[in-house]
Structure formats: structure tokens, C-alpha cells
């Protein structure tokens, strides 16, 4: 775990320092308030894994407090907080924000689970969010907004066990309108995860294991 831990740049947990630029918001399609929760949730995940390595089975009070803070911010967020431009389609933004929010819900659940094999109840919780992420993604097929869906698709895809849905997601990533190599790499990463029979190869922690096992260098928002 320590070999795969990088120093934290606090800049990525709050993007407000960029707000005075005219281009602020464009990179994250106005949804920077959601995207900046991702590295914070990743910090939580790292803390839980460190605790488990030290033999602490249950989440510490610090982890619980951080989880609750992130979840409160996530659930208090609404699309009216997005930094928008006149050309932005409000309906599309609603679908994108829904996909990001529910993939963050998955990530927060997985963070508290840590390296434990998820039970049936947790898997069912994951699946309820997965359905919403992919439902939102289908409404944005081949639109310019798909550029912001890489992270949600990876997180939701890591919890997908239905073969037809796996194939559909793989094709979506490989046939992205932007034809970017990292989309194909994302598809390959998910395929390695899906093909591995190890029960730990599931969810965001499974992605972490797949990246470690196959010595893959991959990062995305």
C-alpha cells in the first residue's frame, strides 16, 4: 500500500483557488464541486486500507467522521451549484451529475468496506447505484458530455457482474466519439477485473488490485 501512495496536493481537494479565471468550470463541465469530492473519498479509502493493514477491522472514528462529512457534502449538492455557461444543456448536466453522484456513493461504500469481501447486502447497495449510473450514461450516448463519464463508468463497471452489461460498457469505451487511448486502456483494465475469479476482484478495491497485479499505470477523473 505504501508503495502506491503518493503525497497529497491539497489543491485537488478544493478547486476554489481557480475560481477567478474566466475558464473556471470548463474542465469539469461546471461540476467541480462533485469532482473535488473524488480525491477526498480516495483519502478515506486509503485510511481504511491502512487501518486494516494494522489489524483494525472496524472503521475508526476518524474514518467515520470523514465519510459522513463527504457524504453530507455529496447529498447537499444540487445541479444549481454547477458553474454553467449558456451553451450547457441543463438536462444533460442533470444526467451527468447524477452519474457522478451515484458513482461517488459506490466509492464511499467501498471505502468503508476497505479490503473486505462485500456481503450480499453491500453488493445490492452497489447495484442500485450502478443501475442509475448506466441509466444516466445511456441518455448521453455519443454526446460531448461522455468526456466527463470516464470515472463514473470505471467505478460502476467494477461492480458490474452481468455479462451483457460488461460487453456494452466495453464497447462504449472502445467506440468513444473521442477515440482516446485511455478509453481503450480503461476497457482493458475492466476486462482484467471481470475475468479474474478472485472474489476480491470486485468494485473499486478490485480495480486497485487489478492495477497492482498487472502493474498498470492508470489514473483518471
Model-found features: residue ranges?
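Intrinsically disordered, low-complexity regulatory regions with latent secondary structure
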Residues: 175-221
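Cytosolic regulatory protein-protein interaction regions
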Residues: 5-150, 155-174, 178
Amino acid at each position: 500500500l505504501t508503495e502506491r501512495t503518493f503525497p497529497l496536493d491539497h489543491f485537488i481537494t478544493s478547486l476554489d483557488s481557480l475560481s477567478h479565471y474566466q475558464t473556471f468550470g470548463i474542465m469539469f463541465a461546471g461540476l467541480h464541486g462533485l469532482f473535488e469530492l473524488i480525491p477526498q473519498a480516495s483519502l478515506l479509502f486509503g485510511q481504511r486500507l491502512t487501518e486494516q493493514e494494522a489489524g483494525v477491522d472496524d472503521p475508526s472514528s476518524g474514518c467515520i467522521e470523514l465519510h459522513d462529512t463527504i457524504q453530507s457534502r455529496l447529498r447537499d449538492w444540487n445541479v444549481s451549484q454547477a458553474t454553467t455557461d449558456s451553451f450547457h444543456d441543463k438536462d444533460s448536466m442533470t444526467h451527468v451529475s447524477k452519474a457522478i453522484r451515484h458513482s461517488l456513493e459506490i466509492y464511499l461504500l467501498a471505502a468503508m468496506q476497505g479490503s473486505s469481501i462485500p456481503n450480499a447486502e453491500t453488493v445490492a447497495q452497489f447495484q442500485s447505484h450502478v443501475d442509475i449510473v448506466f441509466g444516466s450514461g445511456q441518455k448521453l450516448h455519443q454526446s460531448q458530455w461522455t468526456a466527463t463519464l470516464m470515472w463514473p463508468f470505471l467505478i460502476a463497471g467494477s461492480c458490474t457482474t452481468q455479462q451483457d452489461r460488461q460487453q456494452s460498457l466495453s464497447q462504449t469505451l472502445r467506440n468513444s466519439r473521442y477515440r482516446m487511448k485511455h478509453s481503450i486502456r480503461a476497457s482493458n483494465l475492466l476486462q482484467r477485473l471481470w475475468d479474474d475469479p478472485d472474489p476480491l476482484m470486485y468494485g473499486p478495491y478490485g480495480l486497485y488490485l487489478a492495477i497492482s497485479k498487472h502493474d498498470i499505470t492508470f489514473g483518471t477523473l
